[in-house]
C-alpha cells in the first residue's frame, strides 16, 4: 500500500537504505528528515529561500543545496511569502509576498547530475506553481531515469490551470509513468510511478488508483480526530 511521508505519497516497496532521494522545495527539511528516518536513504534537499535553507539540518543522510528548481539555469526573482511554504518563483502566489530576492536557478538535468544517482529512486516536487514548467522542460531521457515522483501540483489553489496539469500527466503517461491522484480537490498530492523501472502489475496499479486515495483519506481524518481528542 502507498504511504504518506510528511503529506507526500510514496510507495515504500521502492525505497530502502540504498535509495537516493531528491527533494525540490525542501523548505525547513521536514520531508527530508522524515524520509531518511523512515527508510535510512540519502536525500538531497534543495531550497532557495535563505531562512528555511539555513535551518535544514545536514547529516550523514541529508545534504542540502541552495537553489531554485526551474526550467533553465540562471538568476531569477524569488517571492518570499509570509508563510514560507508558499514562497515561489511565481508572482501569483496566493500568500502575501513580503520580499523579492534573486536566487540561483538550476534545471532538473543539472540537479540530477549533481545528485549523480542513476536511476533516482524518488523525486519529490513542491515548488509552488513552478512544477509544470520544470517537468515539461526536462528531457524524456532524464525523466525516464526516475523510479517514482511525488508532486504537489497547484491546480487546487488556482496557481496552475487544471488543463496544464492534465497535459503534463498525459505526457508522463506516454513516457511509461502511471499516476494516482491522492487528494480530493485538484492534484495537491499526486503519486507517479515509472512502470519501466518498477516491477508493479497493472492489477496493483488499478487497485491503488481505486482504493488508496479513500483509505489514506480515512487515515488522515482519523489522525486529525485523535489529535483533537488528545488536545481536549
Residue ranges of each PLM-predicted region?
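Phosphate/nucleotide-binding beta-alpha loop and adjacent structural elements of enzyme active sites
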Residues: 1-232
Amino acid at each position: 500500500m502507498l504511504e504518506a511521508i510528511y503529506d507526500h505519497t510514496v510507495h515504500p516497496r521502492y525505497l530502502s537504505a540504498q535509495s537516493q532521494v531528491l527533494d525540490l522545495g525542501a523548505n525547513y527539511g521536514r520531508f527530508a528528515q522524515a524520509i531518511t528516518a523512515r527508510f535510512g536513504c540519502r536525500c538531497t534537499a534543495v531550497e532557495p529561500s535563505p531562512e528555511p535553507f539555513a535551518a535544514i539540518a545536514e547529516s550523514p543522510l541529508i545534504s542540502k543545496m541552495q537553489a531554485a528548481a526551474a526550467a533553465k539555469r540562471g538568476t531569477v526573482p524569488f517571492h518570499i511569502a509570509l508563510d514560507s511554504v508558499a514562497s515561489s518563483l511565481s508572482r501569483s502566489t496566493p500568500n502575501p509576498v513580503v520580499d523579492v530576492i534573486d536566487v540561483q536557478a538550476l534545471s532538473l538535468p543539472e540537479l540530477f547530475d549533481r545528485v549523480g544517482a542513476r536511476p533516482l529512486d524518488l523525486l519529490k516536487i513542491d515548488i509552488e506553481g513552478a512544477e509544470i514548467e520544470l517537468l515539461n522542460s526536462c528531457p524524456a531521457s532524464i525523466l525516464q531515469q526516475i523510479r517514482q515522483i511525488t508532486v504537489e501540483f497547484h491546480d487546487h489553489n488556482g496557481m496552475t490551470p487544471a488543463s496544464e496539469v492534465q497535459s503534463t500527466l498525459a505526457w508522463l503517461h506516454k513516457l511509461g509513468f502511471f499516476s494516482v491522484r491522492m487528494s480530493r480537490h485538484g492534484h495537491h498530492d499526486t503519486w507517479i510511478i515509472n512502470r519501466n523501472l518498477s516491477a508493479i502489475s497493472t492489477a496493483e496499479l488499478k487497485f491503488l488508483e481505486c482504493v488508496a486515495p479513500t483509505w489514506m483519506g480515512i487515515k488522515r481524518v482519523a489522525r486529525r480526530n485523535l489529535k483533537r481528542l488528545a488536545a481536549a
